[in-house]
């Protein structure tokens, strides 16, 4: 055995370099199967929100540019800058393929962003990420006590919330007052994005009620951050939040009251439901014993090198007595969802990789199916046949399954009705001076 020379350090002497890399967290093998920023959050919830926000933010930016000024944003309940990242992650759909900068809201367009939150730890995390930008500021304040602005502060163009923030208004009166303040402070034009927990999410079917004066607030337990075994081990340590459940009908009532109080119109531009069968508490079944871990299944579709069991994606909706309209709606969604999965499994079963063709003719989707379902089925047929030539790199796991995930996402995005039938209900409003 040769001896180590002065110019050839012993292997063990080099190990601290790896230890330092591990401590930095940069060597961590991050999974999108669980956690706050799982695959559903990144590829479904964030992107669905961005898709609905895009046309409104596009028009707002055009308006600011025509007035020779830049956009001012007030993010209420900013957390660790999640809202800022959601907005700056919106892509400009008019960008050319050769463009490198495709963000809609760039630093060039941003005049000022202020994030407001009551949690100091989240604010410190946000500041560590973006505090170096002089056009970004974070402030500790409770927006349920009113708009956290001083009398002389310039009005904002966009008043933004995300991921159920407005459900912290346990009493509608505080939200009415806040929205009225925004309307009163609007000098020319403002856009308001309101984000609540949906009243009729399948996740908390046991809380459904036909009397909107009941079950207005829920005891929301933050148990989804753990897997099933850890969840029970930490049961006594779990955080509980009191959060308002909101339907579209209730949201419209609150906004109408705020408009009346302000003496100005607050016009609804649209509502959308986010995460119909993929809300976080589908996997915990905390509020619905019939809930299935569909979110985990969808996370698996988008996880690299991981093969998903199609059976884990099949929904078996259990109706709730006394809610015929909701039962019909969820039954319809379930049938569309399951049909797309079964169709894709059939494609995989009859496709021959060696011959790069289907062994048997693939039937066309029935004309009675909704247009979006027919479209997604046809696209999945192209996906399966289009990657048949890939004999390495796990084409099913890394190409076909993610595309099925996106097809299911398009299905839910198209068939949602913005009524509060999902984990999140988002309303977009505008205030315009006469």
Predicted stretch roles:
Residues 168-181:
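A short, conserved alpha-helix within the catalytic core of class I
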Residues 149-159:
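A short acidic, Gly/Pro-enriched loop at the edge of an enzyme's catalytic core
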Residues 80-146:
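Class I SAM-dependent methyltransferase SAM/SAH-binding core
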Residues 20-65:
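Class I SAM-dependent methyltransferase Rossmann-like catalytic core
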Residues 277-434:
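C-terminal lobe and adjacent flexible extensions of AdoMet/dcAdoMet transferase-like proteins
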Residues 70-79, 191-223:
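Conserved class I S-adenosyl-L-methionine
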Residues 239-262:
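Short alpha-helix
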């Amino acid at each position: 055995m040769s001896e180590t020379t002065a110019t050839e350090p012993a292997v063990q002497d080099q190990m601290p370099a790896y230890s330092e890399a591990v401590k930095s967290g940069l060597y961590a093998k991050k999974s999108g199967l669980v956690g706050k920023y799982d695959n559903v959050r990144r590829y479904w919830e964030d992107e669905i929100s961005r898709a609905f926000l895009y046309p409104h933010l596009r028009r707002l930016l055009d308006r600011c540019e025509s007035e020779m000024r830049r956009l001012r944003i007030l993010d209420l309940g900013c957390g660790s800058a999640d809202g800022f990242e959601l907005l700056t992650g919106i892509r400009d759909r008019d960008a050319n393929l050769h463009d490198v900068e495709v963000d809609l809201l760039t630093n060039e367009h941003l005049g000022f962003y202020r994030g407001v939150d009551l949690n100091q730890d989240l604010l410190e995390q946000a500041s560590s990420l973006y505090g170096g930008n002089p056009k970004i500021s974070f402030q500790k304040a409770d927006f349920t006590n009113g708009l956290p602005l001083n009398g002389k502060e310039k009005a904002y163009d966009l008043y933004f919330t995300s991921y159920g923030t407005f459900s912290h208004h346990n009493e509608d009166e505080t939200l009415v007052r806040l929205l009225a303040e925004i309307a009163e402070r609007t000098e020319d034009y403002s856009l308001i994005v309101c984000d609540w927990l949906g009243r009729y999410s399948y996740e908390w079917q046991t809380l459904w009620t036909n009397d909107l004066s009941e079950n207005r607030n829920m005891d929301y337990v933050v148990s989804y951050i753990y897997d099933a075994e850890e969840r029970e081990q930490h049961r006594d340590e779990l955080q509980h939040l009191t959060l308002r459940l909101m339907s579209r009908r209730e949201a419209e009532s609150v906004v109408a009251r705020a408009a009346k109080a302000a003496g100005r119109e607050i016009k609804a531009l649209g509502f959308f439901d986010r995460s119909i069968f993929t809300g976080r508490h589908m996997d915990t079944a905390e509020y619905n014993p019939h809930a299935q871990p569909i979110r985990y299944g969808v996370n698996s579709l988008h996880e690299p090198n991981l093969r998903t069991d199609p059976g884990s994606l099949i929904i078996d909706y259990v109706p709730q007595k006394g809610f015929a309209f909701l039962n019909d709606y969820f039954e319809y969604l379930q049938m569309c969802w399951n049909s797309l999965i079964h169709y894709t499994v059939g494609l995989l079963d009859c496709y021959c990789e060696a011959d790069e063709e289907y062994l048997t003719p693939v039937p066309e989707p029935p004309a009675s199916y909704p247009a979006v379902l027919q479209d997604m089925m046809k696209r999945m047929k192209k996906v399966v046949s289009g990657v048949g030539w890939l004999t390495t790199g796990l084409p099913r796991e890394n190409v076909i399954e993610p595309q099925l995930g996106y097809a299911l996402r398009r299905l839910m995005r198209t068939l949602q009705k913005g009524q509060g039938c999902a984990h999140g209900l988002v309303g977009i409003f505008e205030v315009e001076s006469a």
